[in-house]
Amino acid sequence: CAEAATGSVCQIANDNGGGQLVISGSKPAVEHAARLCTEKGAKRALMLQVSAPFHSALMQPTADAMREALANVTVNAPIVPVVANVVVAPVSDPQEIAARLVEQVTGRVRWRETVEWFAANGVTTLYEVGSGKVLSGLARRIDRNVATANIGAAADIDVALAALN
C-alpha cells in the first residue's frame, strides 16, 4: 500500500484471514496497488464495487459526523461482552464503545484476529446477523472448530435464543 499510495491514501481496510486482504483508499492508488500485487505474485487482485473508500483515512469526515451523532445518543453498557473489532478486545464502558465505533469508520477490520481472539477465549459459536454468510465462511476458514449460525430473518432470532438457553 505504501508503494502504491504515492501521495494519496492506500491502506489495508480488512484482514479477512486466509491471506485475503482488502485495501481501500483513492481509486488510482488502489488500482495501482492491485497491479503491484499481481506483479509481485498475488494469487489475484480484484477491484470490489463499493460506494466509498470504507475503513480508510478518506472516511474521516464520516467518522467526524458519526462522533457528533453519537454525542446525542445514550449508549448503555452491554449485557454480554462486546468485542470491538478495531482493537480486538472486549469493551464495556459506554464512552469507549462510542469511541471505538467512530474509530472503526476509518480503522482496519481485524476479522482474522477477532476470530482468533474468540477461539482463544472459549467462544465456540458465532452468529452472523444479516442476509449474507460471508463472515461465517471467513470465520470457518480461520478456525475450523468454530460453529456458525446465521440470523437473516426475525424468526431466526427466536431459534438462536433457544439454542443459547
Label each residue range with its predicted role.
Residues 1-149, 155-158, 164-165:
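Acyltransferase
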